């Protein structure tokens, strides 16, 4: 039985079937450039969607430009919560303390609610969750943020969520254990392995009607 386009999200240039709404994707990889490329391909909102991005390492303006490179016009449909740079744009909220996950969660939920008033369909991304893990004393607080704010908004709304983790990052904890713990909360896991200067292999689990492994251009 086919699923209507209103029930799915297109994947742009990625060789993946449209993804059903409500899907949460844990995106991992140890090459930052490859991980970033795939993240924005999944997170850039299309014409009938809004985008909300938590950006831990780039300014809001840089994040908006990255979205627009993937889908022209998407920066005008997006809001960014940025821990780097300054918020001089109506589309950018500044995260003053990345370790204050209570405030981050409240702000994320508020921005998502505002976005859904403009357009019910949304894409929400966190880049990079590994940076958030490195800023907190107890990684379990990150799990609570994801479950209480990020994943719960996907379950309630008409959205697609992408949470990216740089597995090469030093977060002061066992990365393999962190990823294993987070995988239990996400519907889909995609691991990105760079295999050439402009090429990567995606190892996929949990995504119906898609191959277990696909090659993508970066």
Show the residue positions of the predicted features:
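Short acidic, S/G/P-rich loop/turn micro-motifs used as interaction or catalytic elements
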Residues: 31-34, 59-60, 130-139, 168-172
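Conserved beta-strand segments of the P-loop GTPase G domain that flank and frequently precede/overlap
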Residues: 25-30, 53-56, 81-83, 125-127, ...
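Nucleotide-state-sensitive switch-loop elements of NTP-binding domains
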Residues: 58, 67-96
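Phosphate-binding/switch loop-helix module in NTP-utilizing enzymes
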Residues: 86-151
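Glycine-rich P-loop/Walker A and Walker A-like loops and their local beta1-loop-alpha1 context
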Residues: 2-68
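Short, aromatic/basic amphipathic alpha-helical patches
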Residues: 61-73, 174-182
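Phosphate-binding/switch region of NTP-binding enzymes
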Residues: 164-218
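Loop/turn-to-beta-strand initiation segments
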Residues: 50, 120-123, 155-165
């Amino acid at each position: 039985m086919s699923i209507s386009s209103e029930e799915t999200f297109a994947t742009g240039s990625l060789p993946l079937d449209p993804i059903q709404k409500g899907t949460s994707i844990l995106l991992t990889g140890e090459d930052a450039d490859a991980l970033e490329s795939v993240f924005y391909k999944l997170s850039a909102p299309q014409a009938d969607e809004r985008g909300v991005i938590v950006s831990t390492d780039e300014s809001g303006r840089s994040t908006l430009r990255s979205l627009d490179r993937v889908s022209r016009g998407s920066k005008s449909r997006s809001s960014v919560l940025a821990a780097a740079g300054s918020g001089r744009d109506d589309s950018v909220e500044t995260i003053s303390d990345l370790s204050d996950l209570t405030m981050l969660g409240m702000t994320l939920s508020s921005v998502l609610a505002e976005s859904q008033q403009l357009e019910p369909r949304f894409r929400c991304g966190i880049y990079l969750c590994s940076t958030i893990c490195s800023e907190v004393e107890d990684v379990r607080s990150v799990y609570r943020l994801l479950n209480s704010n990020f994943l719960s908004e996907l379950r309630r709304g008409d959205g697609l969520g992408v949470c990216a983790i740089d597995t090469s990052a030093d977060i002061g904890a066992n990365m393999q254990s962190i990823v294993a713990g987070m995988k239990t909360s996400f519907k889909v896991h995609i691991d990105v392995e760079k295999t050439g200067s402009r090429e990567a292999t995606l190892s996929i689990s949990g995504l119906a009607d898609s191959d277990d492994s696909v090659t993508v251009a970066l």
